[in-house]
From Swiss-Prot:
Organism the protein comes from: Rattus norvegicus (Rat)
Keywords recorded for this protein, A-Z: Cilium biogenesis/degradation, Cytoplasm
Subcellular localization, as worded in the UniProt entry: Cytoplasm; Dynein axonemal particle
Protein name as catalogued: Dynein axonemal assembly factor 3
Lineage: Eukaryota, Metazoa, Chordata, Craniata, Vertebrata
Similarity-based family: Belongs to the DNAAF3 family.
Record's keyword annotation contains Secreted: no
Role description: Required for the assembly of axonemal inner and outer dynein arms. Involved in preassembly of dyneins into complexes before their transport into cilia.
Gene Ontology terms: biological process: axonemal dynein complex assembly; determination of left/right symmetry; heart development; motile cilium assembly
Gene: Dnaaf3
Annotated region (Disordered), positions in chain: 455-534
Broad class of the protein's primary localization: cytoplasm
Length: 583
């Protein structure tokens, strides 16, 4: 059995990392309205951004790291994911990134981040940190007041009570509530998923990996990914080998998720690894850099690997975020605010709000969200959620950024073109128009919200007169912030939500007449079920390990009623049909 080329089935049902470079969201947002400063709570211009499927927080980290290059601004990030494990990883990543330097040094934080974020297996020391941090977060989730006191940058208030309970259960599982490696045998799960994905080509998996890397990722701009690190990740799931490979043997429980499978004619819940096994975590931070010396070549070969560039970029991000938070922590308008009490904690200059999982089509019903956001980001796996209802939450003149499928190795050029065309159709139906003044990009599609303002830029208030240079942020056409070296910002794209992992493409270039129809090219989306830890005792009794479901992985095929997000975006009908979920 071999999956046809272009099927897009290598990316799983849950996305754990971004598949395109990180964005500075300030560079993507419209100019600041100077009149809005007096309307905000802190008398400081605010950026309200809604992110669908950002997955790993890379856009927010990049935005905070480059905030010192822009005029003072406060950030309100509203994040919507399609599973609570992704929400939990967001919380873990930011709690690590914002850890006090006295408790954990910069290098240790960056190395711990890389392993938790991109490695299927961990070192024992990192696994111990994960257990301790997960236990701490599990105790904070049920206590909103204590959570806001200790983590003032985080808000879980929009989440439903049952979602908070399930989120707590996820952290309990991470902290070792269920003992033993057999609870989540990552190495076996990775190998079984790889066997099912490659099928008859499993014995030639190294050749398949080389083909995908050299003929696809390298051709699409990711030349710095070295074949040794790509092969190692495809074989073992370890992307960043910061120590000897033998040191990595503890399963990374943050990559565990659940789904419904068919077992002897019944639907049962199973825990497994349903993430990406095709592209890898190298694209998010590893193929672009502000320091161009990292990208230089010698004799036609890059002098640095994607792993080395990723480690450098993450370290610089953490250093810049720490430097920005220190002197520029917002306590309100300094001229009008009384001196704070000695014991009062400084207010964070940003807040991350996590929204309910199914709220994309109901946000516009709340007046606090209607017309609020200056920027909307949508990953390619969430494009099916872009609708006129969601567009109503964007202010006139606000910007929309949609990631494209450039780094999805299962997709052929004609499928990539069809996806890009479909994105334009969906965005226009939602009330957006393409930006014509920006440089064309194969990674992101950029739009602006139609309204009272003209194409010239942003809100009508911005166009009514000249804006003081101290407040006006650069226009979207000049994407880079005002700095001397004009270093381009990293761009990011979040991975699509894909289902089962049928095989990769054949070793030889596919024939034109072998291309599957567009409806079959993208990976299907998994059944969304609550975290296994949050189930009732009766439900928990039917939870089976993945290996117990059936022989080899015959029953791992997605149920026929599940619809893929990317497949839905490529459907030829003009209407966006809602996803059908298995109950």
């Amino acid at each position: 059995m071999t999956t046809p080329a272009g099927s897009g089935n290598g990316f799983g049902t849950v996305s754990w990392w971004g598949l395109s470079p990180a964005l500075d969201l300030q560079a993507e947002s419209p100019p600041v309205d100077p009149d809005s400063q007096s309307k905000t709570e802190h008398k400081i211009p605010e950026l309200d951004a809604l992110l669908l499927g950002s997955v790993d927080g890379r856009h927010m980290l990049r935005t905070l790291a480059r905030a010192m290059l822009w005029p003072l601004r406060r950030f309100n990030f509203y994040v919507l994911e399609n599973n609570l494990e992704a929400v939990a990883r967001h919380m873990l990543i930011f709690s690590l990134a914002l850890e006090e330097p006295e408790k954990m040094g910069l290098q240790e934080r960056s190395e711990t981040f890389l392993e938790l974020w991109g490695n299927a297996l961990l070192r024992p020391s990192v696994a111990a940190f994960l257990r301790a941090q997960a236990s701490h977060l599990s105790n904070l989730v049920p206590e909103p007041d204590r959570l806001e006191e200790l983590l003032p940058w985080l808000s879980l208030r929009p989440l439903k009570f049952r979602e908070r309970d399930a989120l707590e259960a996820v952290f309990r599982f991470w902290s070792g509530g269920e003992k033993g490696p057999e609870v989540f045998p990552m190495s076996r799960l990775w190998d079984s998923r790889l066997r099912h994905y490659l099928g008859s080509r499993y014995d030639a998996r190294r050749g398949v990996a080389d083909w995908d890397l050299r003929m696809k990722l390298h051709d699409r701009g990711a030349q710095v990914i070295h074949f040794h690190e790509f092969r190692r990740w495809r074989d073992t799931g370890v992307a960043f080998e910061l120590r000897d490979l033998s040191a990595y043997h503890v399963p990374n429980r943050t990559m565990a998720s659940g789904r419904l499978l068919s077992h002897r004619g019944e639907r049962v819940a199973a825990r497994g690894y349903w993430g990406d096994i095709a592209t890898g975590p190298f694209v998010a931070f590893g193929i672009e850099a502000d320091d161009k010396s990292l990208l230089r070549t010698s004799n036609g070969q890059p002098v640095k690997t994607a792993s080395e560039i990723t480690q450098h970029n993450v370290t610089e991000l953490f250093r810049d975020v720490a430097a920005w938070r220190g002197p520029r922590a917002i306590k309100g308008n300094v001229e009008e605010t009384k001196s704070p009490e000695p014991d009062a904690p400084a207010q964070e200059p940003f807040t991350i709000h996590f929204l309910p999982l199914d709220s994309s089509q109901t946000l516009h019903h709340k007046t606090c969200y209607r017309g609020r956001f200056q920027l909307l980001y949508v990953s390619c796996g969430m494009i099916h959620l872009l609708s006129p209802e969601l567009g109503a939450c964007v202010a006139p003149g606000g910007n929309l950024v949609v990631e494209l499928a450039r780094y999805l190795v299962d997709l052929r050029p004609k499928e990539l073109k069809a996806f890009s065309d479909r994105v334009v159709e969906i965005a226009q139906a939602a009330g957006f128009a393409p930006h014509t003044g920006t440089k064309p990009s194969e990674t992101f599609a950029r739009f602006y919200k139609l309204g009272d303002s003209t194409r010239g830029g942003g809100d009508s208030a911005v166009e009514s007169g000249p804006v003081p240079s101290k407040v006006l942020a650069p226009t979207p056409e000049s994407i880079n912030p005002p700095q001397a070296d004009q270093a381009p910002s990293l761009e990011v794209m979040s991975p699509p939500k894909v289902d089962q992992t049928p095989p990769l493409e054949a070793m030889s270039p596919p024939e034109a007449d072998q291309a599957p129809p567009l409806e079959a090219m993208s990976p299907p989306r998994a059944d969304q079920i609550p975290p296994l830890e949050a189930m009732s005792p009766l439900q928990a009794e039917v939870v089976l390990p993945l290996e117990a479901i059936s022989p080899p992985q015959a029953d791992l095929a997605p149920p026929p009623e599940v619809i893929s997000p990317v497949q839905e975006a490529l459907a030829m009908s003009s209407a966006i049909a809602p996803l059908k979920h298995v109950t």
